[in-house]
């Protein structure tokens, strides 16, 4: 496994997670989970939480949600996709129930206001375009 030097990252005091455990559980999730990439090249999202008992909250456009981007040379921001009430995303997706992600999610939820939480999978040498997400 590749090791990463995190010396230039900001460390949140009193908050430590085991990256190796996350990676191990991620590998299990990736083996079992088919992720949806709704018509977007080089974008794969695996939702970690959902609206309680609403499977549609983690499919289609709900995976991406509304964002703003500069789409052309006018320099004006335009909104794309659908509005999502991030505050409703409070239930862990069942695939993550028996993983270390649950412990991390619960710890973060106690300290911070969370909206949708998802894993974004990016192919090597690919990036997301400049964009701005709505604030919770």
What does each model-identified segment do?
Residues 1-106:
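Non-heme Fe(II)/2-oxoglutarate
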Residues 107-111, 116-119:
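A short, contiguous structural element within a folded domain that forms the immediate neighborhood
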Residues 118-135:
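Conserved short histidine dyad/triad with adjacent acidic residue
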